[in-house]
């Protein structure tokens, strides 16, 4: 079966490794576009929805085609020719979730209207039954995307609420990091079991929590199952997911994870989130200043940070000072094999701080985060 996933653009390399670890065979990676196409068996559906830490949505690919000067009639014909009786039961409702990118003489609303009509007519042809449409809470979500001249039609196995919404969060920081990006940064750091992980500006605790979930082999889908659910259950039932759950072996090991923040309110919220995620006992939350790390710690193996960008929190001038002093302090507690991973939208300002503190940039790349272009830096001494 063919599939495609969506994720934060820029993190395709990390999600590719995750898909392959689940047994998926990569067919195409859309670099910096947040899409990966692959194939595999049905088990991939519950595996990715329940176990993936870096992917936001998984879809079954029903049709993909380049159509020069694509028109609404082209969309109708391709959608009409799909056997919808295979995916939608007679008593189920459906909804089209359209997406359009590029220059066209139609809107995404037009795509939704035409595709919806095609599904209804196609089903009537095959079953002599008119399917129900439910735009708010459909049983089956059909994704119809027109990306320039390409038409992509798929069944959404995740649902309207993407996988980055884990379900454990009870406290929201005003600039909290997307959970799938946080997990991707932890993967990037190659953090070992016996190493210390420090987030010096932890906010609501996303990075420490995602790191702890990873080390304890706690599936991220565990907390969203009852809160948000998974759309594939409506199509395939619980059997596939139950089989995956039986294979999971969690552990209660204690790992060296520290979340630091100078705002006690954020720390209290982070503790609540960690408690909900069943990892509070392995994370030490400390009130402290990211520019004075040497006063709290002798050394750290892995530092991962999502510092303020000066957009939602802090002014540009204060951010520049923070970056300079943070890197200066981080350098004092790093050793030869330490890694420092930072994500920021103020990459020019951060590059100045890197140069000023003589760090080596091992890797850097762009990541789209909430409509904002950010840059990830992997630094060593």
Curated annotation (Swiss-Prot):
One of its GO terms (molecular function) is tRNA (guanine) methyltransferase activity. S-adenosyl-L-methionine binds at residues 173-177, 204-206, 261, 289-290, 306. CDD domains: AdoMet_MTases, THUMP_AdoMetMT. S-adenosyl-L-methionine-dependent methyltransferase that catalyzes the methylation of the guanosine nucleotide at position 6 (m2G6) in tRNA(Cys). Pfam families: RlmL_1st, THUMP, UPF0020. Residues 43-157 form the THUMP domain. This is tRNA (guanine(6)-N2)-methyltransferase. Belongs to the methyltransferase superfamily. InterPro entries: DNA_methylase_N6_adenine_CS, RlmKL-like_Mtase, RlmKL-like_Mtase_CS, RlmL_1st, SAM-dependent_MTases_sf, THUMP_dom, tRNA_guanine-N2-MTase. Its main location: cytoplasm. Its EC number is 2.1.1.256. GO terms for biological process: tRNA methylation. SUPFAM superfamilies: S-adenosyl-L-methionine-dependent methyltransferases, THUMP domain-like. It comes from the Archaea. One of its GO terms (cellular component) is cytoplasm. It is found in: Cytoplasm. PANTHER family: THUMP DOMAIN-CONTAINING, TRNA (GUANINE(6)-N2)-METHYLTRANSFERASE THUMP3. Transmembrane segments: none annotated. The keyword Transmembrane helix does not apply. Keywords: Cytoplasm, Methyltransferase, RNA-binding, S-adenosyl-L-methionine, Transferase, tRNA processing. It catalyses: guanosine(6) in tRNA + S-adenosyl-L-methionine = N(2)-methylguanosine(6) in tRNA + S-adenosyl-L-homocysteine + H(+). Gene3D superfamilies: 3.30.2130.30, Vaccinia Virus protein VP39 (3.40.50.150).
């Amino acid at each position: 079966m063919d599939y495609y996933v969506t994720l934060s653009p820029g993190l395709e390399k990390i999600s590719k490794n995750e898909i392959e670890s689940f047994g998926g065979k990569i067919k195409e990676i859309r670099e910096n576009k947040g899409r990966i196409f692959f194939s595999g068996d049905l088990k991939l559906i519950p595996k990715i929805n329940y176990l993936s830490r870096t992917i936001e949505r998984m879809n079954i690919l029903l049709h993909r085609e380049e159509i020069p000067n694509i028109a609404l009639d082209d969309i109708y014909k391709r959608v009409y020719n799909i056997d919808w009786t295979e995916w939608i039961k007679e008593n189920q409702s459906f909804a089209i979730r359209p997406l359009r990118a590029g220059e066209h003489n139609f809107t995404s609303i037009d795509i939704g209207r035409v595709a919806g009509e095609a599904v209804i007519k196609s089903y009537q042809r095959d079953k002599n039954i008119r399917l129900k449409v439910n735009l708010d809470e459909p049983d089956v979500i059909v994704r119809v995307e027109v990306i320039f001249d390409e038409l992509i039609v798929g069944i959404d196995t995740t649902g309207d609420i993407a996988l980055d919404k884990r379900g454990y969060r009870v406290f929201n920081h005003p600039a909290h990091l997307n959970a799938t990006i946080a997990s991707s940064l932890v993967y990037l750091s190659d953090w070992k079991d016996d190493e210390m992980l420090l987030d010096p500006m932890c906010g609501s605790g996303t990075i420490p929590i995602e790191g702890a979930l990873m080390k304890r082999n706690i599936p991220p889908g565990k907390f969203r199952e009852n809160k948000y659910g998974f759309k594939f259950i409506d199509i395939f039932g619980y059997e596939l997911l139950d089989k995956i759950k039986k294979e999971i072996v969690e552990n209660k090991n204690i790992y060296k994870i520290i979340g630091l923040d100078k705002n006690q309110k954020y720390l209290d919220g982070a503790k609540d989130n960690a408690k909900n995620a069943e990892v509070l006992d392995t994370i030490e939350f400390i009130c402290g200043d990211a520019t004075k790390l040497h006063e709290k710690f002798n050394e750290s193996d892995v530092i991962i940070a999502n510092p303020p960008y000066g957009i939602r929190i802090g002014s540009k001038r204060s951010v520049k000072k923070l970056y300079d002093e943070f890197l200066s302090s981080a350098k004092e507690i790093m050793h030869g094999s330490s890694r420092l991973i930072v994500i920021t939208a103020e990459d020019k300002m951060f590059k100045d701080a890197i140069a000023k503190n003589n760090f080596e940039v091992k890797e850097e790349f762009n990541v789209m985060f909430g409509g904002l272009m950010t840059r990830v830096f992997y630094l060593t001494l």
